């Protein structure tokens, strides 16, 4: 049960920011992977703020989140990697749509997009950190 919740949680973080889940899930790995994943996550935080960034619910964005969610979900579920991967995908897809709805509603209310994006960054990072820390 604990692996299932962790997988859903890291998947949700991935749905908000694609590279946050993998960066957190594999932070303890050896080699250059962790640095590459962290750099990709930081790059995503910057790119997300650009007006030209496509919607996360477009096919490519959802596919990237599903793949990252699967890898991250499996990474935090050592006892049940396949179930972890499936739950990571579910969490990522659900959070992608919820995050997009949040941003649409914020825009409708004329809230500052940059501040809303930073809040979403903070939510993704906080969730990912919580999941990884609960894994130890």
Language-model features: where?
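Short amphipathic, positively biased membrane-proximal segments
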Residues: 1-136
């Amino acid at each position: 049960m604990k692996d299932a919740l962790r997988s859903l949680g890291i998947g949700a973080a991935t749905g908000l920011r694609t590279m946050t889940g993998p960066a957190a899930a594999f932070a303890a790995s050896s080699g250059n992977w962790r640095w590459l994943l962290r750099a990709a996550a930081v790059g995503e935080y910057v790119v997300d703020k650009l007006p030209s960034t496509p919607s996360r619910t477009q096919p490519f964005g959802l596919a990237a989140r599903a793949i990252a969610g699967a890898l991250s979900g499996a990474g935090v579920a050592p006892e049940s990697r396949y179930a972890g991967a499936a739950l990571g995908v579910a969490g990522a897809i659900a959070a992608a749509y919820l995050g997009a709805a949040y941003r649409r509603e914020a825009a409708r209310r004329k809230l500052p997009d940059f501040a809303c994006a930073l809040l979403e960054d903070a939510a993704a990072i906080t969730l990912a950190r919580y999941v990884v820390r609960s894994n130890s």
